[in-house]
Amino acid sequence: MLIYPKIYLENATKISEKIIKENNIKGIILDVDNTLLYYNREMLENVDIWCNNLKEKGIKFCIVSNSNKKDKIKMIAEKLKIPYISFGMKPLKFGLKKAQRILKLDS
């Protein structure tokens, strides 16, 4: 079984409180490459502020990356103070289901 995103936006920080409320979102699973990091490997501008603001509103976060570079994923997760899963094997469900359990979210 494959799992696909339900919402597509320009970048992660475009997920607004309005979108979260309209879609009853309780948690956000993020990728690293081209989601939290730009193509040039710099962190997406203001992603830490965006993440902290939503965490204050009760939104849970987890990084699920297909990368096997655990140190890179861990560094980003620690900066954002969120859990992470490296080598998540997306679009297969294993890493995403693990993130769902970590965040204690229903399917």
State where each predicted segment sits:
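Substrate-recognition element of Asp-dependent hydrolases with the DxDx(T/V) motif
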Residues: I28-L30, T35-E42, V47-K74, M89
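Non-catalytic pre-domain segments flanking phosphatase-related domains
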Residues: M1-L30
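A generic secondary-structure signal
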Residues: I19, N53, K98-I102
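Substrate-recognition "cap/lid" segment bordering the active-site pocket of phosphatases
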Residues: I3-E10, S67-S107
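Well-ordered alpha-helical segments embedded in enzymatic catalytic cores
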Residues: I15, N46, G95-K98
